[in-house]
């Protein structure tokens, strides 16, 4: 099962993510934040709130309670 072991804020809406399958990459959440109408996602437009996350339950969880599945986060990795 895919999970996130570690995550570090990079810049803007980007987070460096370390997966248990060995992949390390930069996930860019800017398009999601700008295009999703869900209130919890829209709150992350505040960059200070975006920076407030932790790795819990094998994924990234923001202080407003929002989280995404590790598989979705992996799809956000810059190629």
What function would you assign to each model-found segment?
Residues 1-79:
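Motif-centric detector for short Cys/His coordination patterns
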């Amino acid at each position: 099962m895919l999970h996130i072991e570690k995550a570090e804020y990079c810049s803007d809406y980007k987070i460096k993510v370390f997966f248990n399958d060995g992949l390390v990459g930069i996930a860019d959440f800017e398009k999601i934040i700008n295009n999703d109408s869900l209130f919890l996602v829209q709150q992350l437009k505040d960059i200070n709130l975006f920076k407030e996350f932790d790795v819990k339950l094998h994924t990234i969880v923001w202080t407003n309670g929002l989280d995404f599945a590790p598989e979705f986060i992996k799809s956000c990795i810059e190629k």
